[in-house]
Curated annotation (Swiss-Prot):
One of its GO terms (cellular component) is extracellular region. It comes from Homo sapiens (Human). Involved in complement regulation. Can associate with lipoproteins and may play a role in lipid metabolism. Residues 20-85, 86-147, 148-206, 209-267, 268-332, 333-394, 395-453, 456-514, 515-578 form the Sushi domain. Pfam families: Sushi. This is Complement factor H-related protein 4. Keywords: Disulfide bond, Glycoprotein, Repeat, Secreted, Signal, Sushi. Glycans are attached at residues 127, 186, 206, 374, 433, 453, 557. Expressed by the liver and secreted in plasma. Disulfide bonds join 88-134, 117-145, 149-193, 176-204, 211-254, 240-265, 271-320, 303-331, 335-381, 364-392, 396-440, 423-451, 458-501, 487-512, 516-567, 550-577.
Length: 578
C-alpha cells in the first residue's frame, strides 16, 4: 500500500504546474552508498526535491569534506553529481631537498598543493617551486628538486660565458684551444644542464690520439656498428656468438691511438658426471643418465663426515662452467683445533674447526720462539691433517767461552743466529784457525766456542786387536775429543768403548776378548753333546755358560759341575763321558 502511495505521489509531483519533472532512479554512488539502502531501494524512483543521507568509503569524502552528507534529487538529476571525492594525504608526498609550503594535511580530488625547493636546488623545469594535484589514483606525481649545474672542468677548452651556475636545460657554449677539436671535429660546441648534470664533458682532443675501428675477435663481434674514427677514451663493447663465453673485459678503450686488449670467445664445453671425492650428488643415481650437461647447470651435493664445502656447510651447489665443475674441490678436509699440541705457546684464534688450506696462528710464551726465531707462527690444514705441530723453543743465551772471546755484545740469540768468536793468543780452534762461529739450533749452540793449545792435541787413537774405531781416523784430534771402538763378530769388548784425548795422550783403549768355539771334533773326543741344541759348532762369549750332556750310551766321567762349563777368554774346559 505504501509503495502504491509513493508511486501516485511521484506522478503528482512530476505533473505539478503542468510541467513534467523527471524522477530520480536509485543513486549508484561510486566509492560510497546510501544509508539503509536495502530498505530505501523499494521507494525509487524518487521525486525531485527528495534528499537522502549517504556515506563515503575510506580515503574518500563528500564535496563538503565530511565522510557523510545528503544527496538531493533535482530536475537535472542527483546533486552532487560526484558524491564521493578521492582524498590525498600530505604524508604520502616524498620530497628530497624540498618541502611542502602549505599547512593542510588532507587534499581532495583536483586540489593542488605547492612545494618549494631548498636553496641550490630547482624543479625539473628549473623553478624554485612547483605544484602537484590530487587525482583519482593519488598525487599526480612525486615532487622533484634537483641541483643546479656548476661551471664544469674544461679539458683543452674554455667557456664562452662568465656564469658560475646554470639552471636545468641551460646551454653553455665552449671553444677548443688551438690544435684541438671536439668529438665531432669542430672547434666549438655546447653542453646542456640536465637532471644528472651536464650532457657531456667540455673536452677537446688531439686528432693524433684517435683510433681506427676496434680489432675483430674470433667467434664474436662488437655490439655496435663500427666507425671509421674513435676519439680517445671511447669504449666499444664485444659479445660472443651462441655457445661461446666471453673471457676478459667485454670493453676495449681507445688510448693514445691504440685499443686496449680485446676479450676472447671461449667454447663452452659440456660437463661430465662429477665424481666428488669425499662426497656425492643428491639423487645421483637418478641424475646420472642426464649427463653430460651444458654450461650453467647446477646440482646440489653433500660431503662425507669430517669434510665440508668451501662455504663451510655440509652441502652446497656444484656449477658447470666453461672450465669444468666449480668448485674444483667440492669437499674440503676439516682440521680440529683440539688436535694441536703446543708446548710453551698458545693458539691466538677462537675458531675450533678449520677447512683445507686454512691457516691458524699461534704465539710463543715470552722467552720462547718458533723454529724460525719468531714470536709467532702459523700452521695449515692439509688433506691429511695439520701441516705440522707448532713448536716454541727457547732462545740461545750467551755461551761459556774457553780460551776464547765473543766478537759481538748480544746477550741472547734467535734460532739460526750465528755468533762469531776468536781465540786468545797462542790458542786455536779444532781446525787450526784462530776464529770460528757457532749457530743457535733447536737444542742450543752447534758446539762450544773452545780454543786449544796445540801441544794438548792427540794423534790417531791406538789400534786394538780384533777391533777397530767406528769412525774414519783423523791426523789430529783436539783435547777432549772422543773416539768409539767396536769388536769383530763374537769378540767381547772389555773396558770403555770410548777413548778420550787429554794433554796430548789417549786414555786406555778397550780389549776385544776371544770367543769360545765349541766344535764337533772336541765334543766327539769327550763323547758329549750340547744340551738342548743340535748345533755342531757353537760360539760363546767370555762369561757365557755352556751346558753339555753325555751322548747316548755314555756316562759322565767328570763332576756334575763340569757339564756347565764357563767360557773364559776363548778357553773352555770340556767334561768327559766314558
Amino acid at each position: 500500500m505504501l509503495l502504491l502511495i509513493n508511486v501516485i505521489l511521484t506522478l503528482w509531483v512530476s505533473c505539478a504546474n503542468g510541467q513534467e519533472v523527471k524522477p530520480c532512479d536509485f543513486p549508484e554512488i561510486q566509492h560510497g552508498g546510501l544509508y539503509y539502502k536495502s530498505l530505501r531501494r523499494l521507494y525509487f524512483p524518487a521525486a525531485a526535491g527528495q534528499s537522502y543521507s549517504y556515506y563515503c568509503d575510506q580515503n574518500f569524502v563528500t564535496p563538503s569534506g565530511s565522510y557523510w552528507d545528503y544527496i538531493h534529487c533535482t530536475q537535472d538529476g542527483w546533486s552532487p553529481t560526484v558524491p564521493c571525492l578521492r582524498t590525498c594525504s600530505k604524508s604520502d608526498v616524498e620530497i628530497e631537498n624540498g618541502f611542502i609550503s602549505e599547512s593542510s594535511s588532507i587534499y581532495i580530488l583536483n586540489e593542488e598543493t605547492q612545494y618549494n625547493c631548498k636553496p641550490g636546488y630547482a624543479t625539473a623545469e628549473g623553478n624554485s617551486s612547483g605544484s602537484i594535484t590530487c587525482l583519482q589514483n593519488g598525487w599526480s606525481t612525486q615532487p622533484i628538486c634537483i641541483k643546479f649545474c656548476d661551471m664544469p672542468v674544461f679539458e683543452n677548452s674554455r667557456a664562452k660565458s662568465n656564469g658560475m651556475w646554470f639552471k636545468l636545460h641551460d646551454t653553455l657554449d665552449y671553444e677548443c684551444y688551438d690544435g684541438y677539436e671536439s668529438s665531432y671535429g669542430n672547434t666549438t660546441d655546447s653542453i646542456v644542464c640536465g637532471e644528472d648534470g651536464w650532457s657531456h664533458l667540455p673536452t677537446c682532443y688531439n686528432s693524433s690520439e684517435n683510433c681506427g675501428p676496434p680489432p675483430p675477435i674470433s667467434n664474436g663481434d662488437t655490439t655496435s656498428f663500427p666507425q671509421k674514427v674513435y676519439l680517445p677514451w671511447s669504449r666499444v663493447e664485444y659479445q660472443c656468438q651462441s655457445y661461446y663465453e666471453l673471457q676478459g673485459s667485454k670493453y676495449v678503450t681507445c688510448s693514445n691511438g691504440d685499443w686496449s686488449e680485446p676479450p676472447r670467445c671461449i667454447s663452452m664445453k659440456p660437463c661430465e658426471f662429477p665424481e666428488i671425492q669425499h662426497g656425492h650428488l643428491y639423487y645421483e643415481n637418478t641424475r646420472r643418465p642426464y649427463f653430460p650437461v651444458a654450461t650453467g647447470q647446477s646440482y646440489s651435493y653433500y660431503c662425507d663426515q669430517n669434510f665440508v664445502t668451501p662455504s663451510g656447510s655440509y652441502w652446497d651447489y656444484i656449477h658447470c662452467t666453461q672450465d669444468g665443475w666449480l668448485p674444483t674441490v667440492p669437499c674440503l678436509r676439516t682440521c680440529s683445533k683440539s688436535d694441536i699440541e703446543i708446548e710453551n705457546g698458545f693458539i691466538s684464534e677462537s675458531s675450533s674447526i678449520y677447512i683445507l688450506n686454512k691457516e691458524i696462528q699461534y704465539k710463543c710464551k715470552p722467552g720462547y720462539a718458533t723454529a724460525d726465531g719468531n714470536s709467532s707462527g702459523s700452521i695449515t690444514c692439509l688433506q691429511n691433517g695439520w701441516s705440522a705441530q707448532p713448536i716454541c723453543i727457547k732462545f740461545c743465551d750467551m755461551p761459556v767461552f774457553e780460551n776464547s772471546r765473543a766478537k759481538s755484545n748480544g746477550m741472547r740469540f734467535k734460532l739460526h743466529d750465528t755468533l762469531d768468536y776468536e781465540c786468545y793468543d797462542g790458542y786455536e780452534i779444532s781446525y787450526g784457525n784462530t776464529t770460528g762461529s757457532i749457530v743457535c739450533g733447536e737444542d742450543g749452540w752447534s758446539h762450544f766456542p773452545t780454543c786449544y793449545n796445540s801441544s794438548e792435541k792427540c794423534g790417531p787413537p791406538p789400534p786394538i786387536s780384533n777391533g777397530d774405531t767406528t769412525s774414519f781416523l783423523l791426523k789430529v784430534y783436539v783435547p777432549q775429543s772422543r773416539v768409539e771402538y767396536q769388536c769383530q763378530s763374537y769378540y767381547e769388548l772389555q773396558g770403555s768403548n770410548y777413548v778420550t784425548c787429554s794433554n796430548g795422550e789417549w786414555s786406555e783403549p778397550p780389549r776385544c776378548i776371544h770367543p769360545c768355539i765349541i766344535t764337533e771334533e772336541n765334543m766327539n773326543k769327550n763323547n758329549i753333546q750340547l744340551k738342548g741344541k743340535s748345533d755342531i759348532k757353537y760360539y760363546a762369549k767370555t762369561g757365557d755358560t755352556i751346558e753339555f750332556m753325555c751322548k747316548l750310551g755314555y756316562n759322565a766321567n767328570t763332576s756334575v759341575l763340569s757339564f756347565q762349563a764357563v767360557c773364559r777368554e776363548g778357553i773352555v774346559e770340556y767334561p768327559r763321558c766314558e
